[in-house]
């Protein structure tokens, strides 16, 4: 009996207090990314208003004054919805000319989950697509009316699913794309390693 008691005492004495501790969960962090980029000619012939969903779920608007508009927002909350639409309105003073019109709209996110998993995903228009040629005010107006909308919901698990976001006046008939090209383009803008795509 004395030998059994000493064995139990020795085994418990060798045990570390760290054996019973579990690693505390990491704090969840989500970074939302939005990018709108237009060709030089777009700003010559149109006004661009960027509509997006912020980290609280509220819809926001900002006037685009340069070729590239970028927004990065931080939140700790999932699920969330991201939405982006560049409302492109032709100027009343458009004259005939040789215009090369292009808009890139991309939305993405990086989720660092409490379980340590990191997910990077994004949707948008093809950044490699060729510009559209327009010569008349009517052709410019027709192009402006086709500005694509990006929309998706990110689940509590960190995965995205496409959805429609109504900004009033936008159409969601143009499908979003996701692929390594969009992901790599987004990574390069925000300084992330494109190998994550």
Regions found by a protein language model. Name each.
Residues 41-55:
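Short, ordered, surface-exposed loop/turn motifs in non-cytosolic proteins
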Residues 27-38, 79-88:
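Noncatalytic modules at the cell exterior or secretory-pathway interfaces
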Residues 7-33, 194:
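Bacterial Sec-dependent N-terminal signal peptides
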Residues 39-43, 92-101:
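Extended, low-complexity, turn-rich repeat/linker tracts enriched in Gly/Pro/Ser/Thr and Asp/Glu
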Residues 54-90:
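Tryptophan-paired
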Residues 97-113:
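Exposed low-complexity, polar/acidic, P/S/T/G-rich flexible segments that act as propeptides
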């Amino acid at each position: 009996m004395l030998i059994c008691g000493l064995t139990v005492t020795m085994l418990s004495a060798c045990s570390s207090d760290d054996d019973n501790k579990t690693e505390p969960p990491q704090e969840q962090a989500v970074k939302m990314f939005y990018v709108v980029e237009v060709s030089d000619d777009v700003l010559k012939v149109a006004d661009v208003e960027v509509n997006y969903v912020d980290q609280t779920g509220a819809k926001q608007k900002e006037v685009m004054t340069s070729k590239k508009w970028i927004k990065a927002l931080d939140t700790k909350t999932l699920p969330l919805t991201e939405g982006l639409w560049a409302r492109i309105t032709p100027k009343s003073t458009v004259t005939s000319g040789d215009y090369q019109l292009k808009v890139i709209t991309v939305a993405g996110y990086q989720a660092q989950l409490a379980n340590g998993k990191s997910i990077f995903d994004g949707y948008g228009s093809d950044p490699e697509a060729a510009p559209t040629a327009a010569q008349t005010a009517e052709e410019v107006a027709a192009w402006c009316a086709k500005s694509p909308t990006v929309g998706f919901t990110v689940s509590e698990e960190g995965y995205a699913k496409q959805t429609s976001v109504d900004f009033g006046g936008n159409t969601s008939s143009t499908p979003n794309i996701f692929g390594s090209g969009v992901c790599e383009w987004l990574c390069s803008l925000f300084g992330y390693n494109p190998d994550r795509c």
